[in-house]
Amino acid sequence: MSWNGVKRKVAKITTWEQRRDSMNGACFNCHDHTFVDNFYHQFDSLVVLYNDKFAKPAQQLMDELTKDGVLSAKAPFEHEVQWVFWELWHHEGRRARHGASMMGPDYTHWHGMYEVSKHFYMKFLPAVVDAAAEKSPELRKKYQEKVTQLLTRDENRWIKGLSPEEAAALKKAFKERYNQWRGSWI
């Protein structure tokens, strides 16, 4: 059914590759190949970043919580972690992906990936441990260890911060690259 109640039939199902080729045709009406290729590189990179850093680890934790009997498929919004998980995908994640697809930096970053990051680290991961703790102390410990292990991955190193040597090297590289600017914050 369509929005107006009239039943419609899809004439042809196309693949994502066919849809992208069709969209490229529209893009090339105004933009050259470099512009279009760079856009898709940035867009695809954001989707991969979202998927690999947030969506896949979150889905794995949700699947494991379900397997351990902490979550029930019959009660999809029983625990806080289920709400936050849904919002990571549907609300913040969708805004980031749609913002990137429409070249909207404010929606891509502030209303998208910033919110995804904030809720993943500050709400979702603690809610994983809290949900497990409701089931048993053993599961709380198991999921605290899983979260701790996740936070040791390279993409999450920022949480720990830089060593003094790493900070000095970063500051030196920054000054070498931007030495024409003498701001007080460097």
Predicted features by range, described:
Residues 1-186:
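Primarily the internal scaffold of c-type cytochrome electron-transfer domains
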